[in-house]
């Protein structure tokens, strides 16, 4: 069965050349017209002009432009991952006198009356209008083509499908595709006093209003007993403009498993700080396992409060830009990586994954354990990316940490960097694509990203060991001790052990037992055959035979700020 947010348009009239026009009564849209509603919200790049509506040709969304002339004379949009299709353009305007929406579309020689042409007309497809409608199962549906709005953490976060601030949903065996913004939302409820407040009120930055909305949610019933504990499994999620799955607060204690998440934000017609295959804030005790992420503008983005989060047994590849021409400085470049963990205090466990994109992990964070992974990309943004971008004044970002396995807030703190563990990983340096080198030149070394393209733990060189860190606090440290208060703001320790490095991947300087193989050339990649993906590599022929240490909760210890162990959600 199909649940669609779109309707067929079949009254096309030829205008000129490849351009056709059609009129639709605004009565079709009810009280929500996607063609008078612009995509907007906190952390959306304002220079992008896009309506929440879309036009689809045979199920594929076309490219909105801002004038009729751009429909008549379309140009290739080089930021898109699918440039050839970008000349299929559309423009819309309102006929106020007739109360109609007028479409102008370039079909590149096709007769739209002989093809399937649809426009999305509904904001959601399967989504309660009220909060608190829990314990619903959606199984085996095709859900597609809704006119969803941008879903930042400081707004009412909607998707085509979602539980709308409730508990215990199961979304399984569904195909979720072609949402204007987000496919599935496990997101925040509407707080009328704090809904895109940064955009609307302007006087408080979004980082502050986000802290405010978290505290407000706690006062208004955000608890383990009321919210979250959803399951998303075995879904095919693709071709959405912002995210495949989005969430803030509402996704706590959930399981996201065995999904295929791909081709997200490939059109590059939306840009901002909320884009990825999955983008979740406050993924407290969320388990993300056995998913396949590929061809996304970033695979998985865990932002703030990835506390008790586990990312395990996933396959990631092709989640960085294909070519340098796809980079867009106006859109924060959107270079992408497999996993981005941002200003969280942990504990976040990343284990038994295969990460094959050019950039494996962006780690502007602390409290992360990276264990038993096969990694063929680089670590970026280590030791940076945690301030708020002020030009001249200090702008540290304070983020919450919580009572272990609960939503109640225990405190707020900046990110000091470090407090990370790297055990028993295989690092392989892939050949660096010319396009990635050009992107690095284009974006440079900046506050948010260092552009590193070398695999391995070398970005953590110079971080203290636990023994070095503890030694700084020897003796009395209280008032009048003579010790500098800087002690409490210096980098935290990093633990390393059992890692193997091939093809020029580099270990951190302080790693004592690193195995660095400079003799053998390792090949690695993935290949699709008959709908199945295979890992092709010769690394198994050259792995050292020495035994690695068994890694356990006791080995990993606790994340510094929340003082919480790396343990299962049940403690």
Where does each model-flagged region fall?
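Glycan-recognition and catalytic cores of secretory/periplasmic carbohydrate-active enzymes
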Residues: 386
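Residues that act as N-cap/strand-start positions at coil-to-secondary-structure junctions
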Residues: 49, 84, 120-122, 155, ...
């Amino acid at each position: 069965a199909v649940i669609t947010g779109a309707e067929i348009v079949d009254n096309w009239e030829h205008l000129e050349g490849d351009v056709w026009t059609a009129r639709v009564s605004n009565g079709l849209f009810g009280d929500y017209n996607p063609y008078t509603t612009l995509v907007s919200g906190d952390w959306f790049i304002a220079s992008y002009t896009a309506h929440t509506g879309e036009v689809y040709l045979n199920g594929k969304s076309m490219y909105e432009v801002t004038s009729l002339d751009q429909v008549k004379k379309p140009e290739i949009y080089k930021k898109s991952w699918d440039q050839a299709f970008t000349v299929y353009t559309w423009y819309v305007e309102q006929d106020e006198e007739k109360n109609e929406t007028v479409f102008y579309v370039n079909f590149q020689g096709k007769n739209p009356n002989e093809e399937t042409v649809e426009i999305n007309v509904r904001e959601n497809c399967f989504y309660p209008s009220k909060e608190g409608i829990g314990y619903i199962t959606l199984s085996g549906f095709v859900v597609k083509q809704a006119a969803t709005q941008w879903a930042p953490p400081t707004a009412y976060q909607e998707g085509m499908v979602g539980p709308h601030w409730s508990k215990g949903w199961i979304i399984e065996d569904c195909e979720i595709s072609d949402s204007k913004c987000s496919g599935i939302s496990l997101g925040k409820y509407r707080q009328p006093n704090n809904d895109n407040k940064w955009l609307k009120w302007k006087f408080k930055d979004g980082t502050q209003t986000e802290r405010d909305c978290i505290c407000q949610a706690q006062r208004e019933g955000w608890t383990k007993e009321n919210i979250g504990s959803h399951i998303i499994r075995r879904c095919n999620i693709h071709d959405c403009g912002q995210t495949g799955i989005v969430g803030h607060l509402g996704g706590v204690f959930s399981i996201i498993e065995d999904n295929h998440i791909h081709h997200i934000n490939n059109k590059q017609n939306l840009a901002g700080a909320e884009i990825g295959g999955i983008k979740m804030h406050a993924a407290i005790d969320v388990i993300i396992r056995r998913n396949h992420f590929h061809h996304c503008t970033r695979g998985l983005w865990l932002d703030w409060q990835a506390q008790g989060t586990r990312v395990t047994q996933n396959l990631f590849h092709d989640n960085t830009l294909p070519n340098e021409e796809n980079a867009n400085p106006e859109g924060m470049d959107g270079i992408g990586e497999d996993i981005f963990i941002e200003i969280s205090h942990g504990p976040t466990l990343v284990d038994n994954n295969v990460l094959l994109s050019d950039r494996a992990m962006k780690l502007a964070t602390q409290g992360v354990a990276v264990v038993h992974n096969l990694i063929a990309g680089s670590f970026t943004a280590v030791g940076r990316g945690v301030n708020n971008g002020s030009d001249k004044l200090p702008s540290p970002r304070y983020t919450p940490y919580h009572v272990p396995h609960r939503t109640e807030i225990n405190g707020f703190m900046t990110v000091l960097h470090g407090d990370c563990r790297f055990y028993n990983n295989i690092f392989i340096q892939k050949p660096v694509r010319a396009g990635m080198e050009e992107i690095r030149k284009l974006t440079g070394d900046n506050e948010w990203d260092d552009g590193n393209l070398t695999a391995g733990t070398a970005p953590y060189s110079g971080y203290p060991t636990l023994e070095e860190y503890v030694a700084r606090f020897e003796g009395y440290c209280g008032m009048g001790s003579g010790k500098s208060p800087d002690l409490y703001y210096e980098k935290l320790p990093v633990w390393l052990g059992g890692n193997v490095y091939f093809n020029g991947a580099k270990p951190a300087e302080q790693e004592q037992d690193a195995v660095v193989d400079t003799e053998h050339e390792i090949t690695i990649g993935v290949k699709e055959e008959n709908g199945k993906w295979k890992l092709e590599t010769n690394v198994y022929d050259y792995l050292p035979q020495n035994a690695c240490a068994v890694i356990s909760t006791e080995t990993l210890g606790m994340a510094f700020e929340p003082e919480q162990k790396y343990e299962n959600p049940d403690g």
